[in-house]
Amino acid sequence: MGKTVTLTAGHSNTDPGAVNGSDREADLAQDMRNIVAAILRDDYGLTVKTDGEGKGNMPLRDAVKLIRGSDVAIEFHTNAAANKTATGIEALSTPKNKRWCQVLGKAVAKKTGWKLRGEDGFKPDNAGQHSRLAYAQAGGIVFEPFFISNDTDLALFKTTKWGICRAIADAIAMELGATKV
């Protein structure tokens, strides 16, 4: 079928991103990348480029180079806020990826009941504290399916991680027109 998906994990072993107790954004992002990549490869036979395997990932300057030639490129993150009750799903990108952002957000919302932030899950990459995110400017999507700072959302993610990742992978495959192999 010739479709290529790029999946990357935000942050790294040297930059943990947001932290809640012993849970680090970098680790959760790597888990999401690894699970979604495995489902897309094993169940749909799609070509998946990643910025690493297991607990490794590339620096952002190298990860953005993977985007070229991809049908969709997604970098996994978690959201965080000082307000521990902040919740919701958002995907940040340029307007050309608005539909993809909404597809991803709706898949997670359907699985979890979490609300969609922005325009049905889409936010421009210069929204809020952000300003022209490098990954989005290179053609990718920065996907934040939940708030690591919200204890309830974090607990739900940890207990339903595989189901959430399955929903994301199935939505990607459906949007690309891929069928199970």
For each of these PLM feature ranges, what is it?
Residues 34-45, 68, 105, 109-113, ...:
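Sec-exported extracytoplasmic/periplasmic mature domains
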Residues 46-53, 115-122, 180-181:
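Surface-exposed patches in mature extracellular/periplasmic domains of secreted proteins
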Residues 97-123:
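Active-site-adjacent substrate-binding region
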